[in-house]
Amino acid sequence: AYDPHAPAPAAAPGAERVIKGHPGSAGRVEGVVRRIDSPDEGEQLQPGEILVTSTTNVGWTPLFPRAAAVVTDIGGSLSHAAIVARELGIPAVVGCGDATIRLKTGDRVRVDGGRGIVEILEQA
């Protein structure tokens, strides 16, 4: 029977180091996070960094070739981020919900676009 006062079940070991989203574009890569709020901040993104943002639109497209992977809070398999990442062969995890809260510039992560997960390897 449901007990509203029962303690929440313990999370699996390491669960706090995994961010789940939707598979946007297949591929696995490890790299350093660059959290960006606007394409106007795009000059901060260094080649090979993991682009983390809330969502993307056509204004973000010039940044994608520099990114090793893309992670967004909002979106699905037909979102701008997913489509552009697939076209360029860049792994993407979209629709994570809280990636921009949990990830900071300098964090080291592993992005698995095929499984839709981001593993936090080392926090900055």
Where would I find each of the regions flagged by the language model?
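Non-catalytic, soluble scaffold/interaction modules
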Residues: 1-124
